[in-house]
A protein has these predicted regions:
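Catalytic nucleophile loop
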Residues: 14-19
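Alpha/beta-hydrolase fold nucleophile elbow
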Residues: 2-13
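Short alpha-helix in the alpha/beta-hydrolase fold that links the catalytic acid
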Residues: 20, 236, 250-260
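Short glycine-rich catalytic loops that host catalytic nucleophiles or stabilize transition states
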Residues: 38, 273-279
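Alpha/beta-hydrolase fold catalytic core
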Residues: 102-249
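Catalytic histidine-centered segment of alpha/beta-hydrolase-like enzymes
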Residues: 277-289
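A catalytic-pocket lid/entrance helix-loop region that shapes and gates access to the active site
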Residues: 22, 26-120
């Protein structure tokens, strides 16, 4: 199939891997890809930077989760999600990052104004934002958002799910509510299918979530590998698919990764981003399963290159 269009797709940690794999295949195997598809990519490079950046990039996700649970001010809550996310994104990039960069040297006036806007876009009370020096950790957000409404927590990988903790007090949820729901659904399904349909009999436990540690990703530089692969191969295009309610690999962090992969901006027309009203696994929502598949089909059709050689 060397003459066929070639694509690789990776989800979550796999999103990081396919960025590196694209460069590896091209440089070591001389295999030139047509497309790289990243589903909820886990590019944690930004999380190792100062919190001024990583915390600011969380805000649009907070807006999405708060909107879903009806915790935003009426001015935002009464609008559609896709109307308010650009407002939160614009504030995060153009106002919040510069404010957070000042750290403890921000003026009291600016500190209070910033806390007010973070509260406005996140559903978290201004007093709580100030108590956290304008930096609300995601663990705390999942615990705090509904604390006074119903005492429930919200999920990490998909914040549409709710959980019930031992105590309403605390700074993080007791468990990831979405995980228990997925395990409850997937575990009996796969075990039934393997045994009854494939007739494969075994007592080995099927791990829905396999062990992934220990690992060392401190030297992760796959972004630049993908950039180089794209520079050398003008027919290589990239599609990123993210769920707005994913609190682990947030959609805005994925956008930031996309922007930073090509600092020159000369390949920006070869990057495509699609967002969905779901979490980490957007295909669990039937409407997004249909739309995500359609987006994939469109991407494949528009990136086949018809067998052209990799040259400008």
């Amino acid at each position: 199939r060397w003459q066929s269009p070639k694509y690789i797709i990776g989800e979550s940690y796999g999103g990081t891997r396919v960025m590196g794999l694209a460069a590896e295949l091209q440089n070591k195997q001389w295999m030139y890809l047509n497309g790289v598809i990243m589903v909820s990519p886990a590019d944690y490079k930004v999380l190792r930077t100062d919190s001024a950046l990583s915390s600011s990039l969380n805000l649009p996700y907070y807006t999405a989760a708060a909107w879903y649970h009806k915790m935003l001010p009426d001015e935002l809550q009464n609008k559609d999600l896709l109307e308010i996310l650009p407002l939160s994104e614009n504030y995060a990039i153009n106002v919040l990052i510069p404010a957070m960069a000042k750290g403890g040297f921000i003026s009291e006036t600016d500190r209070n104004e910033t806390a007010e806007r973070i509260s406005y876009f996140s559903g978290i009370k201004k007093k709580v934002v100030l108590q956290h020096n304008l930096d609300i950790p995601k663990n705390y957000f999942w615990k705090e958002l509904l604390r006074e409404k119903n005492g429930l927590t919200i999920g990490r990988l998909d914040s549409r799910y709710k959980g019930l903790d031992k105590r309403i007090a605390g700074d993080k949820p007791d468990y990831n509510s979405e995980i228990t729901s997925w395990l409850h659904s997937f575990t009996p399904a796969i075990n039934y299918y393997v045994r009854e349909h494939l007739n494969f009999k075994t007592d080995v436990t099927y791990n829905v979530f396999g062990p992934v540690r220990p690992w060392d990703n401190r030297n992760d530089n796959v972004r630049d590998g993908l950039r180089q692969a794209m520079a050398q191969n003008p027919y290589l295009k990239v599609l990123i698919q993210s769920g707005y309610y994913d609190g682990a690999t947030t959609y805005f962090n994925a956008k930031y990764t996309m922007w930073q992969t090509d600092p020159s901006g000369r390949m920006r027309d070869r990057f495509f981003f699609k967002g969905y009203r779901s979490g980490h696994m957007m295909y669990l929502r039937n409407e997004d399963l249909i739309q995500a598949n359609e987006d994939l089909r469109t991407f494949l059709k528009e990136s086949s290159a018809n067998g052209k050689a990799a040259k400008y």
